[in-house]
């Protein structure tokens, strides 16, 4: 059986990879994928702690996080499609040049 410590280390590694991806990458789609990876690493932590403590609160909270992540992905991708139609690029530097 895999220990809690292993799950927490895996979650920290996934979160770190996601954070580095958000900070380094310029492509908005890749940034969204890295944010989703970070959310999934938090979900892994919730599930591992929920199983370790014998409490279902962490598992219930994961459903809410997954719902918010799905909504965030839908809105983010819709914005990226609209931006691509407008500028024909999804580079983050081009988004900074946009004015309201």
Curated annotation (Swiss-Prot):
Query: What cellular-component terms does GO give this entry?
Result: NADH dehydrogenase complex; plasma membrane
Q: Which GO terms describe its biological process?
A: ATP synthesis coupled electron transport
Q: Where is the signal peptide?
A: none
* Cellular compartment(s): Cell inner membrane
Q: Does this UniProt record's set of keywords contain NAD?
A: yes
Per the record, what are the reactions this protein catalyses?
a quinone + NADH + 5 H(+)(in) = a quinol + NAD(+) + 4 H(+)(out)
Membrane topology term? Multi-pass membrane protein
Q: Which residues cross the membrane?
A: 4-24, 29-49, 60-80
Keywords assigned by UniProt, alphabetized: Cell inner membrane, Cell membrane, Membrane, NAD, Quinone, Translocase, Transmembrane, Transmembrane helix, Transport, Ubiquinone
Enzyme Commission code: 7.1.1.-
Q: Does the keyword Translocase apply?
A: yes
Primary place of residence? membrane
InterPro entries attached here?
Answer: NADH_UbQ_OxRdtase_chain4L/K, NUOK/Mnh_C1-like
GO molecular function term, any single one:
NADH:ubiquinone reductase (non-electrogenic) activity
Q: Which family does it belong to?
A: Belongs to the complex I subunit 4L family.
Q: Which NCBIfam families match?
A: PRK05715.1-2, PRK05715.1-3, PRK05715.1-5
Q: How does it assemble?
A: NDH-1 is composed of 14 different subunits. Subunits NuoA, H, J, K, L, M, N constitute the membrane sector of the complex.
Q: What does this protein do?
A: NDH-1 shuttles electrons from NADH, via FMN and iron-sulfur (Fe-S) centers, to quinones in the respiratory chain. The immediate electron acceptor for the enzyme in this species is believed to be ubiquinone. Couples the redox reaction to proton translocation (for every two electrons transferred, four hydrogen ions are translocated across the cytoplasmic membrane), and thus conserves the redox energy in a proton gradient.
This chain's protein is named: NADH-quinone oxidoreductase subunit K 2
Q: Which organism is it from?
A: Geobacter metallireducens (strain ATCC 53774 / DSM 7210 / GS-15)
Source lineage: Bacteria, Pseudomonadati, Thermodesulfobacteriota, Desulfuromonadia, Geobacterales
């Amino acid at each position: 059986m895999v220990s809690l410590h292993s799950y927490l280390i895996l979650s920290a590694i996934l979160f770190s990879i996601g954070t580095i991806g958000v900070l380094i990458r310029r492509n908005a789609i890749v940034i969204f994928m890295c944010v989703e990876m970070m959310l999934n690493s938090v979900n892994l932590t919730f599930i591992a702690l929920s199983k370790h403590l014998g409490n279902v609160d962490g598992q219930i909270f994961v459903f809410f996080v997954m719902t918010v992540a799905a909504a965030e992905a839908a809105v983010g991708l819709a914005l990226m499609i609209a931006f691509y139609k407008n500028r024909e690029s999804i580079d983050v530097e081009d988004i900074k040049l946009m004015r309201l």
